[in-house]
């Protein structure tokens, strides 16, 4: 389910910059699938349509749920130049949604930066109050608990939901679907068709 997105990127000469905010024990596959779509968009067009960076709350390296460490480009505060922010969560997301994270996410939202949740990153957005009035989705294992904890949210049992400037997906390969729709809304369906043929 998607509403239109207008970042005016088709007319811009600079790349659309996506910052991935990693939470501890993030799901590596969901993150790498999302980045893979952006990389393929650049490769197929031979242009730098998208750039991306990886940040953590405090700028320190993090270990994924698979036990692999990812190089971090900076802290959440360093992500001011992002056009889009995507929060990547994992199995233990509730442990990591403290005041510093919610305050940081609210600052991002106040700058009118579109923001999304990959896998359980949706939970972090909900805790910060950034999904109030929006449709959203989350990993299927977390659907019931999210509905119970946030009964006012409109939570869909969908692979992904794009509602205005909020983007959420259920994790795993659904981050591919989310990012394909994001790319389609910015750079068109023809490019997405070409990207899809590579996966």
Sequence positions of predicted segments:
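Conserved anion/nucleotide-ligand pocket segment
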Residues: 157-197
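A conserved active-site-flanking secondary-structure segment within enzyme catalytic domains
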Residues: 131-162, 194-195, 199
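Short gly/pro/ser/thr-enriched loop/turn and capping motifs at secondary-structure boundaries
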Residues: 122-124, 143-144
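A generic structural signal for well-ordered coil/turn residues at beta-strand boundaries
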Residues: 58, 81, 156, 162-163
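Short, amphipathic alpha-helical segments
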Residues: 95, 99-102, 137-140, 144, ...
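Extended, subdomain-level signal for the structured scaffold at the beginning of enzyme domains
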Residues: 1-115, 124-127, 180, 184, ...
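Residues at the C-termini of beta-strands that transition into short coil/loop
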Residues: 56-58, 74, 140, 159, ...
